[in-house]
């Protein structure tokens, strides 16, 4: 006769942590309510604000792969003049050695490639936007373009790590984790950092991880890259093998064991674990409602392009970002799959990709503005690097970390403004250069945080997001 295994009731705290953790334990540990943690550690509370914030939260729209700036937001008439010709290039001596070598290689192996798309000025600000982004043009006067971005790393792994963690080769906390650590959450029932379909490659979890910061500051993830957002769930929030009522009874027993253990040891981490499970229980009631978009109006669904292709999936991500933002999550990371890396087939690839995200992003900006959320929400659109003005092969562009564009919108941002510039061919940042560290410093500044003062002691030194670099780009502030 087959023996009945695991029949005995688990009676140790460790055993309960294991069995109950299959349902909500993992979420509980890293989605700990920062308001509760602040009671034991004041560095996690809003008392760390160094000045009056303009933004309460951030939505970071990450275009994974490298969007071409000269085909999107940075028109260069010289590309047409020199199309198919060698690049008459000067100015490489101003760049660091790695970038200089990379650009010299591009110059030797490729000829100038003109853009396929037409650029026009839009809005009262006269912002230049190509017809690759027709829906975004409606928001020209709400956007602030930084056209002089540059970063470290010529490979995706390095550059993706830079945009998300501020370091291209070492394990460091992600930007969202630093925001969670510095500000906590506006809603004690939700984590401070949520990543919707996070990037899987080029560093994967490090791009939304907490590294040496307390583990509860890493992102709570919703789905994964390549999965349909409509099917996305928060992992470990519910144990599919037991009913919710049974799970609640497990939690009650676990809490009794934890409290007994706490009275014997009086360790603050045990108390934090107790409270984290309570927060996980609250998430069980709130998170499913946030993920369920069935109550959204038809007008909202049409605004985002939710019920049509090819916009449906990214529209779902942007709509979830608005819902989590509205509910009090501090930092939303919304990523595309790794689709923007057109070393060949640039026109086909960029057209397909822009069609899938242009309307949803436009819808998000409109929705935030209509609800009054854009006044205290910072929206960041970014990509790990740009692309070269010379061709790779016949119809592609190579990586270009020396000069590219990001844009900002919302809280505290000078709307309808373009900052900085690249050279005549869009190859490298030339005027009012902005490094990735500067962008990070500016984001923290808008949240009320001095990037030089937000530090964490680890391995004998004080670490910060911007390391020993970074300056706030004051020109882009309202």
What would you call each of these model-derived segments?
Residues 2-478:
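Ligand-binding pockets and gating/stacking loops
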């Amino acid at each position: 006769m087959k023996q009945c295994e695991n029949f005995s009731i688990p009676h140790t705290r460790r055993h309960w942590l294991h069995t109950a953790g299959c349902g909500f334990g993992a979420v509980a540990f890293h989605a700990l309510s920062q308001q509760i943690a602040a009671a034991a550690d004041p560095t996690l509370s809003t008392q760390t604000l160094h000045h009056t914030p303009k933004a309460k939260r951030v939505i970071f729209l990450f275009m994974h792969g490298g969007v071409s700036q000269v085909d999107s937001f940075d028109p260069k008439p010289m590309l047409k003049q020199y199309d198919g010709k060698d690049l008459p290039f000067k100015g490489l001596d101003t760049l660091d050695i790695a970038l200089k070598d990379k650009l010299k290689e591009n110059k030797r192996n490729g000829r100038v490639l003109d853009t396929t798309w037409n650029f026009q000025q839009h809005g009262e600000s006269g912002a230049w936007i190509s017809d690759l982004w027709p829906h975004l043009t409606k928001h020209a006067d709400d956007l602030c373009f930084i056209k002089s971005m540059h970063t470290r790393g010529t490979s995706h792994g390095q550059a993706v790590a830079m945009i998300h963690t501020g370091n291209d080769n070492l394990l460091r906390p992600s930007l969202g984790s630093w925001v969670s650590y510095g500000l906590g959450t506006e809603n004690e029932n939700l984590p401070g950092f949520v990543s919707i379909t996070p990037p899987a490659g080029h560093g994967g979890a490090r791009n939304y991880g907490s590294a040496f910061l307390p583990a509860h500051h890493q992102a709570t993830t919703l789905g994964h890259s390549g999965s349909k957002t409509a099917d996305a769930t928060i992992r470990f929030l519910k144990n599919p093998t037991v009913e919710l009522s049974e799970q609640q009874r497990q939690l009650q027993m676990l809490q009794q064991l934890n409290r007994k253990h706490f009275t014997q040891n009086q360790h603050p981490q045990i108390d934090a674990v107790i409270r984290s499970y309570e927060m996980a229980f609250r998430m069980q009631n709130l998170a499913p409602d946030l993920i369920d978009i069935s109550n959204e109006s038809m007008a909202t669904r049409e605004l985002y392009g939710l019920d049509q292709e090819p916009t449906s999936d990214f529209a779902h991500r942007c709509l979830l970002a608005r819902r989590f933002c509205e509910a009090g999550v501090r930092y939303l990371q919304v990523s595309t799959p790794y689709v923007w890396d057109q070393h060949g087939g640039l026109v086909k690839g960029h057209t397909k990709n822009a069609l899938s995200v242009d309307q949803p992003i436009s819808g998000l900006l409109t929705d935030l503005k209509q609800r009054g959320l854009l006044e205290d929400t910072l929206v960041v659109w970014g990509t790990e690097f740009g692309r070269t003005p010379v061709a790779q092969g016949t119809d592609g562009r190579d990586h270009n970390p020396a000069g590219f564009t990001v844009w900002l919108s919302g809280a505290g941002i000078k709307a309808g403004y373009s900052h900085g510039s690249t050279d005549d061919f869009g190859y490298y940042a030339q005027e009012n250069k902005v490094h990735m560290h500067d962008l990070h410093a500016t984001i923290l500044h808008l949240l009320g945080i001095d990037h030089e003062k937000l530090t964490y002691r680890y391995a004998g030194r004080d670490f910060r997001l911007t390391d020993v670099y970074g300056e706030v780009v004051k020109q882009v502030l309202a």
